[in-house]
C-alpha cells in the first residue's frame, strides 16, 4: 500500500494504477492527485519522488 501525490501533468499514472494495481482512494487537490493504492514494488521504485 502506498500514498502518492501525482502531478496533473503525469495523470496517466493514475490510469496505470487503476489497470495494474488496486486504487483505494483518489482525491483531486490543488497540488496534484492524491492516490492511496496497492501497487507493485517496481512502480514504487520508479516513482519514489511521488510517495507522500
Regions found by a protein language model. Give the residues of each.
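C-terminal-of-GTPase-core extension/linker across diverse P-loop GTPases
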Residues: 1-52
Amino acid at each position: 500500500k502506498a500514498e502518492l501525490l501525482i502531478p496533473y501533468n503525469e495523470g496517466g499514472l493514475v490510469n496505470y494504477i487503476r489497470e495494474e494495481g488496486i486504487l483505494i482512494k483518489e482525491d483531486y487537490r490543488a497540488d496534484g492527485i492524491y492516490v492511496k493504492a496497492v501497487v507493485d514494488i517496481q512502480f514504487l521504485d520508479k516513482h519514489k519522488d511521488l510517495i507522500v
